[in-house]
Structure formats: structure tokens, C-alpha cells
């Protein structure tokens, strides 16, 4: 096995960059080549049907099912013209990946031959086996029916020879079994609530769109080295491995020159992404060795989320063409930065106004402050839920590790915006509003320079930061489905905007002028949600104590954090917005607890196997060599000199004995602890047991394995070391 390690290292060093052919067309010409976008819809669908479809997508008009046959025919004809032979309903079950079942277009023609067919019924709905996906008890195995239903707002696309149709996935009783269905409901809720508030400022607003711009971080590891690390293969992270002498301390990797093999991978990935309509924009080295980032131009939230799921799938596929494996785990390597997926979120109107962007007049800035403060109120009242939306067994390794946002949700605003809110809070209504001749009402809201958009203070320790014209939710994990965070955030903001309008309307009904009523409520909100505003160092122990004093959620146990989904205020919020029912929330938590348990369980099994089958045998073999050396010393030298010359080896022999004994004892104890935990029927209590007993055991065992790595002869060590995994490109 040690020979395998050195062989794969040698092979990796010899690998050259894969040549990637540059398309003859410009990127703008091959962009969305494999997407059934508006241009293709216009070409392949009758104009009347096309107009109805676009109206449904853009304005939420009901889509008559009778037009589905003509849409399906146009979609099929385009796909066949592109060489496609199969189709699939592409959806995102609660596994956090994507799922698909491929069917061919061919059907019997009744004359002994075959024909290509794709009907509206097949476009609109399919019936996969719902019992085979996580469902939290909503579906029994003998009640397997679940449906995937077409989402016309996200265009179909082609991967290889298959037409992929984005869909939602629901139980036959109507409960959502995926991420897309509640995301669409959350986006609809925030659209309606935001439009109602926007009409205080502009009665012409008819639609508000939530935008998402994600920043995907990832590691690349040579596939030979990856294959020689069973822990990476099975869990996505290294369960053992001592720090490399050099890691990221020189700060020479971030924005550094991109390695040649990696640059070829990035080029290949970008070409594939652009052809699938993913507007990739930025690529660069990240902080840790062999860590990189990809970011697109922001898009409508549902489409952006589909594109992120698709890009993660593409990354896995394209990386193999280049002799790499992509690691999307939030913390594949201990001692260097983990990977996140910052979610840049904002709201925009159909009239072209970015609601999180400052305006040019005091009235515009009142609208801006209105939406910012309502967002802060939503984050304040649901800070535990937002934390639960990004929590997982994998992201827990990253959050709060002095490299990523802490596991306490707070919001950074920066100096300028903080001063504006302080001014409003500390001013009276008469101070803020004065009559100004023919111009009517004058607002004393400080000017917010446009420079703010590019010059907002940067605070990397904040999990939810205002960055000029948007909020950046930085706590989202690199492996996560963005929908989880976006469902929670958009639902909470929608619920808060509804409450805001109700509060303002109540004052207006009492005779208060509209602007005065808005300011009165905003001033109260600024005071109420002050606890969520924190511009300091989120890594400090002082902040943890201060956050607790402020009443923010400071829980660190992931299974307990999930309880936030079932708090009465959370259930009330999701039901009020029509996003999810109590039954759906309960089912999702069952899935979350079960998934957490299974991931820790797999890690425990893998670590136990590696400890017993790799680490202890290698350490014992080296120990035997040391013992033989001591015996030979004793046969060659007088006793006193032999003892002196062998003293260090005797210390190593004893240390190896102690550490291997500790590892064996604690692996056995961990197995027994798993047996005890596995008997617990409650999924919540079982997950808590795994968190409280198995997770600490993994760290204790790892500590001694990593110490052995420093002792054992490098030639004997079977597993690729961090210096090889992180610096061989």
C-alpha cells in the first residue's frame, strides 16, 4: 500500500494539462446552446402558445394544461434536432443532490416499427417511486406514489443525449418532497409582500424578483491521490492527516497564478457551463492550497439555484476528464480553510429598481431603508431558523473555525449604513419630516453615496453582511443546496413585510400621513432588531458572550439547531406565507436528523476500518523495526552504551504502544457507543447521541493517528499525506 502512495504521487507529478479546444464562436454566441430558452421556444412553439407560456413565466398567469401538448412537441422537436434520444424529469430531492430517471422518446407506432413521441402529459408529470427518496415518513414504502411536475419558469436543457426538464417533486397527497416546491412558494410569497410595500413608493410596481448570486468554493485533488485515500472516497473529507509544514500561512495562494492543469479544467468547465446557460463570470485561487472559486452573474433565485446544482454536477464530471476529483465538502482538510458558498441575495422590481440599493433622493432612500430594516427584522426574529437552514454534519466543521462566519447569525451593516439607521432612530418624527414650500414634504434622511456599493466595509467574520446593494449570506456550505437558505430567508422576509404593511396601514387609518407612518414604524423596528446588528469580530469569545446576552441563538449542536424548524413561530411563519405546512416541516426535520446520523455513522465506520487495517498495522510494523534495532544495538555495544544509543528508539516504541492501544480501545468503545445509539427510536435523540458521543470520539482517535503519522517511517505510511494532497497539482 505504501508503494501505491509513492506511485500515485509520481504519476500525478508527471501529468500534463489536458488540451481544451477553444470554440470557434464567441462565448456570447454559444451561450445557452443547449437550453430551451425564449429564442428556441419562439422558434419551435406556435406563437399563441408561446405568448401564453411567457405570460405564465413572467407574470404568474395560470398555465392552461391544454397547451402542454404543443409545448412538449416543440421541446421534443428541438431536442431531436440537437441529437437527443432521451428525456428526464430533473429534480432536487431531500438528499441535497439531484435525481433523474431517463426515458427514451421512442414508442411503438402500431405498425411494427418505432416513432419518437413526447406528449404534454409526459412533460407535465411523471411518477417516480417516492418511497426510495428521503421523505420523513410522509410516504410509506407500500404507498410509493410521488409525482414530479414541470417547472416552466426554469428552462429545459440538454446534457449528453438527454433532455432535462426541471421539476418539483411532491407526494401524491400534495406534500413537497424536494427543495424546489417550497422555494417557488417562498419566492411567490416575497414577491407579493414586497409588491404591496413597494406601492407605498411607486404604484406602478407589479412584480418583485428575488435574486441570487452564489460563489462556489471547492478543492481539486489529483484522482490518483484521491483513490488512495479511502476516507476522501467514502466521506468527502480526510478523517486523519497531520498538518503540512506549509499550508496557507504564507498567504500566497489567494488570487495567485492558477496552476496549468487547474486552468485547463476551469476553461473546460466554463465552456460547458456557458453552453448550458450558466453565466459564469469569475474564477480564482482561494485561500487554501488547491482551493478555488467559481462565481456567476446573479440571476433570478430559482434559476440561479438550478444552475448551482447543475454546476456542481458539471464540476464532478469535468474534473475527471482532467485527472482530478472535485471536493465540495465544507471541510475536506483540517488546519486549512474550508469551503463555503456565499449567497448574495437581493430584491428587484419590474420597474428596474434594486430594493437593497441606495437611491438618489431622500424618498428613494426611505424605500431603501424600509427594505433593509425589514430584512434585519426578519433575520432577528428568525436567526435560529436561518442558522438551521445552513446547518449540517459537514458545515459544522467549518462554521466558527476562525476561517468562516461563526455559528451565531448576526448582520454587519458597515459604518455608513449604521450611521443612517442611528440617525433615524435618534431623531424625532418632526426632525425627520418638515414641510418645504411647493415641494411638499422634505425628508431628513442622510445622503447615501453611490460609492457605498463598491466601498462597503468588509467584515469576513459576519454571516449575514450588507455589501452595498445586497445582503451576503456567508454561512451557506459549499456542498449545500442553496434552496434551503433561500427558502428560510425569503419566507421570513415575506412574513415580515406583511407585518410591516399591516403596522403602517394601521397608523394611516388613524390619520397619520403615509411617509410619517412609515418612518414611525421603521424607527420602532430599528430599536427592536438592534440585537442582530454587529460590526465587530465574530470570532471573539467576547462576541459569543455578548450574543447570548442579546438573546441570539448560540446553540452549536447541529441536531438541536434543527429544532428551530419546529418552533411555534417558525411553523406560524411558514404556514402564514403558504410555503410549508407543519407536517412538511416535521417530515423535513426527520430527514435532517436521519441524514446527520448516517453521515457521522459512515465517518465512524471508515475511521474505524482505517485505524485497524492501515494505521495500527503500519505503526506496529515500524515499532517492530525499532525493536529489532534495539536488540541489534544491545548485541553490538556494551549495555550502558547500548542503552544510551537506544533511548530515543525505546521512547518511540513506548509511544507507539501507548497510541495504538488508545486507538484500539477507543475504536472498540466507539463501536459500542454506535450500538447503543442505534437502538434509540427517535431520530432526533439518535442524532443527538451521535453528536454527543461519536463526534468527540472521532476527534480523539484522529489526534493519536496524526501523532503516529509524525513518528512512523515515511516510506511505510500508506495514505497520501497533506503535503501531497494539497500541493501536487
Question: PLM features: residue spans?
Answer:
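N-terminal hydrophobic targeting/anchoring segments and the immediately downstream early-domain regions
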Residues: 2-24, 141-157, 162
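Histidine/acidic residue-rich metal-binding segments in metalloenzymes
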Residues: 13-19, 23-120, 124-140
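Active-site-proximal loop/turn and secondary-structure-junction residues that shape catalytic pockets
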Residues: 67-71, 91-93, 121-122, 169, ...
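Hydrophobic/aromatic-rich, well-ordered segments within soluble, folded domains that form packed cores
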Residues: 80, 84, 88-90, 307-321, ...
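Short linear, low-complexity motifs centered on an aromatic residue
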Residues: 96-113, 131, 229, 236-238, ...
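Glycine-rich, acidic/polar active-site loops that bind/position phosphate-bearing ligands
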Residues: 143-328, 337-340, 347-590
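Composition- and surface-driven signal marking solvent-exposed, interaction-prone regions
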Residues: 233, 308, 330-331, 357-361, ...
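C-terminal amphipathic alpha-helical interaction region
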Residues: 525-729
Amino acid at each position: 500500500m505504501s508503494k501505491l502512495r509513492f506511485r500515485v504521487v509520481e504519476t500525478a507529478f508527471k501529468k500534463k494539462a489536458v488540451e481544451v479546444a477553444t470554440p470557434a464562436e464567441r462565448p456570447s454566441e454559444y451561450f445557452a446552446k443547449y437550453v430551451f430558452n425564449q429564442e428556441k421556444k419562439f422558434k419551435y412553439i406556435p406563437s399563441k402558445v408561446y405568448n401564453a407560456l411567457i405570460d405564465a413565466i413572467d407574470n404568474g398567469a395560470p398555465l392552461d394544461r391544454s397547451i402542454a401538448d404543443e409545448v412538449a412537441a416543440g421541446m421534443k422537436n428541438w431536442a431531436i434536432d440537437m441529437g437527443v434520444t432521451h428525456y428526464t424529469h430533473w429534480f432536487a430531492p431531500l438528499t441535497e443532490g439531484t435525481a433523474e430517471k431517463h426515458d427514451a422518446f421512442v414508442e411503438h407506432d402500431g405498425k411494427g416499427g418505432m416513432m419518437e413521441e413526447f406528449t404534454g402529459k409526459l412533460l407535465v408529470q411523471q411518477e417516480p417511486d417516492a418511497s426510495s427518496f428521503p421523505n420523513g415518513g410522509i410516504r410509506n414504502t407500500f404507498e410509493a406514489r410521488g409525482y414530479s411536475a414541470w417547472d416552466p419558469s426554469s428552462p429545459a436543457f440538454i446534457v449528453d443525449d438527454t433532455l432535462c426538464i426541471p421539476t418539483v417533486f411532491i407526494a401524491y397527497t400534495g406534500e413537497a418532497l424536494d427543495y424546489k416546491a417550497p422555494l417557488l412558494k417562498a419566492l411567490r410569497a416575497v414577491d407579493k409582500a414586497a409588491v404591496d410595500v413597494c406601492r407605498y413608493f411607486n404604484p406602478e410596481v407589479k412584480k418583485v424578483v428575488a435574486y441570487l448570486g452564489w460563489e462556489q468554493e471547492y478543492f481539486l485533488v489529483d484522482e490518483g491521490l484521491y483513490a488512495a485515500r479511502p476516507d476522501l472516497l467514502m466521506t468527502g473529507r480526510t478523517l486523519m492527516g497531520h498538518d503540512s509544514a506549509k499550508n496557507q500561512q504564507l498567504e500566497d495562494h489567494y488570487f495567485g497564478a492558477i496552476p496549468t492543469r487547474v486552468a485547463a479544467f476551469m476553461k473546460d468547465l466554463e465552456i460547458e457551463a456557458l453552453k448550458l446557460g450558466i453565466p459564469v463570470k469569475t474564477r480564482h485561487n482561494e485561500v487554501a492550497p488547491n482551493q478555488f472559486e467559481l462565481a456567476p452573474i446573479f440571476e433570478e433565485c430559482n434559476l440561479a439555484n438550478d444552475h448551482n446544482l447543475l454546476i456542481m454536477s458539471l464540476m464532478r464530471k469535468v474534473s475527471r476528464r482532467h485527472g482530478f476529483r472535485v471536493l465540495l465538502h465544507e471541510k475536506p482538510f483540517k488546519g486549512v480553510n474550508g469551503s463555503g458558498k456565499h449567497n448574495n441575495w437581493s430584491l428587484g422590481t419590474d420597474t428596474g429598481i434594486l430594493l437593497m440599493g441606495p437611491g438618489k433622493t431622500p424618498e428613494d432612500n426611505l424605500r431603501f431603508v424600509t427594505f433593509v430594516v425589514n430584512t434585519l427584522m426578519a433575520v432577528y426574529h428568525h436567526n435560529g431558523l436561518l442558522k438551521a437552514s445552513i446547518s449540517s454534519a459537514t458545515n459544522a466543521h467549518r462554521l466558527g473555525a476562525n476561517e468562516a462566519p461563526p455559528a451565531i447569525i448576526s448582520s454587519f451593516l458597515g459604518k455608513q449604513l449604521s450611521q443612517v439607521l442611528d440617525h433615524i432612530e435618534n431623531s424625532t418624527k418632526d426632525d425627520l419630516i418638515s414641510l418645504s414650500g411647493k415641494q411638499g414634504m422634505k425628508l431628513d434622511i442622510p445622503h447615501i453615496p453611490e460609492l457605498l456599493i463598491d466601498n462597503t466595509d468588509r467584515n469576513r467574520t459576519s454571516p449575514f453582511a450588507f455589501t452595498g446593494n445586497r445582503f451576503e449570506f456567508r454561512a451557506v456550505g459549499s456542498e449545500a443546496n442553496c434552496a434551503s437558505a433561500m427558502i428560510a430567508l425569503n419566507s421570513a422576509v415575506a412574513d415580515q413585510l406583511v407585518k410591516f404593511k399591516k403596522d403602517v396601514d394601521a397608523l394611516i387609518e388613524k390619520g397619520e400621513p403615509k411617509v410619517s407612518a412609515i418612518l414611525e414604524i421603521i424607527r420602532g423596528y430599528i430599536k427592536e432588531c438592534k440585537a442582530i446588528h454587529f460590526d465587530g469580530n465574530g470570532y471573539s469569545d467576547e462576541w459569543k458572550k455578548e450574543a447570548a446576552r442579546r438573546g441570539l441563538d448560540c446553540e452549536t449542536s447541529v441536531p438541536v439547531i434543527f429544532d428551530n424548524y419546529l418552533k411555534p413561530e417558525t411553523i406560524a411563519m411558514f404556514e402564514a406565507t403558504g410555503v410549508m405546512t407543519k407536517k412538511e416541516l416535521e417530515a423535513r426535520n426527520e430527514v435532517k436528523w436521519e441524514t446527520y446520523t448516517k453521515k457521522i455513522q459512515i465517518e465512524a465506520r471508515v475511521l474505524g476500518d482505517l485505524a485497524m487495517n492501515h494505521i495500527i498495522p503500519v505503526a506496529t510494523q515500524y515499532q517492530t523495526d525499532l525493536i529489532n534495532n534495539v536488540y541489534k544495538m544491545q548485541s553490538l555495544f556494551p549495555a550502558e552504551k547500548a542503552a544510551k544509543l537506544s533511548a530515543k528508539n525505546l521512547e518511540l516504541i513506548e509511544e507507539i504502544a501507548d497510541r495504538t492501544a488508545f486507538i484500539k480501545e477507543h475504536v472498540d468503545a466507539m463501536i459500542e457507543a454506535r450500538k447503543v445509539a442505534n437502538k434509540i427510536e427517535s431520530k432526533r435523540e439518535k442524532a443527538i447521541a451521535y453528536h454527543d458521543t461519536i463526534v468527540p470520539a472521532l476527534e480523539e482517535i484522529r489526534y493519536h493517528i496524526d501523532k503516529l503519522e509524525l513518528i512512523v517511517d515515511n516510506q511505510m505510511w500508506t495514505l497520501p499525506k497533506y503535503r501531497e494532497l494539497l500541493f501536487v497539482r
